[in-house]
Amino acid sequence: FSLEGGWKWINASLYFDHARNMYTTYAKPYDDAKHPGVVLWTMASIPNSYAYGGALVLSPKFGWWQPQFTASLFWFQSNARSLNIQPLWNEVQPDFILNNSFTLPRGWFLNIKGRLAFGAKQSYAIKKTEGTVDAQLTKSFLKDRALRVSLVANDIFRTGTYHFRVYGDRTYNEFENYADKQRFGIRLNYQFNATKNKYK
């Protein structure tokens, strides 16, 4: 079920999803008697899982500055006690995104985007707080602004990590990885026939 609505620069959405017999991958002891300490990763179905939440998007414009602020709340509850996975948390996970666009004089354009997702305990997993900041400065050239030169910086503070803790059948695993999205560079774009002139 989903519901969306908007008015001028305000948009909102709500959703609810119920999944039955959802497949999941989880860990359990392989054989405590013959092979103690050996963990087996396997798949099984969970009788009932629920995901629901909502989002609010604000996109006003103040002259040369156009921010877009997104605030969302997410819940996820998946009861895996039939698989002997005992934790059953249902904390809310807030997520905030601020995307700033600045249309500057003389063909300059600046975009700065930041995201912050707070940690939460949901179902039988624990998510850690994570966030990133990206920026791009663009200068347009030529009469029709067909040539664009951009200075790009992705994941400026190298914070784009993913930290995930998950419980299984008498097991506990912790994962952390870095997506290696940090980039600093120059981008060139040229749009042919930018004015859509059929004689060009």
Regions found by a protein language model. Name each.
Residues F1, N48-Y52, L88-P94, T129-V133, ...:
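Residues that define the transmembrane beta-barrel architecture of outer-membrane proteins
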Residues F1-G5, G54-P60, L73, F96-F102, ...:
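Residues on the lipid-exposed face of transmembrane beta-strands in outer-membrane beta-barrel proteins
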Residues S2-T70, N84, D95:
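Outer membrane beta-barrel strand-and-loop segments of large Gram-negative receptors
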Residues W7, F16-R20, P60-W64, L73-N79, ...:
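Transmembrane beta-strands of outer-membrane beta-barrel pores
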Residues W7-N11, W64-F69, R106-N111, K143-V149, ...:
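Repeated loop/turn-to-beta-strand initiation elements of outer-membrane beta-barrel proteins
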Residues L73-S78, N90-L142, V166:
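C-terminal beta-barrel architecture of Gram-negative outer-membrane proteins
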Residues F141-K200:
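C-terminal beta-signal and adjacent terminal beta-strands/loops
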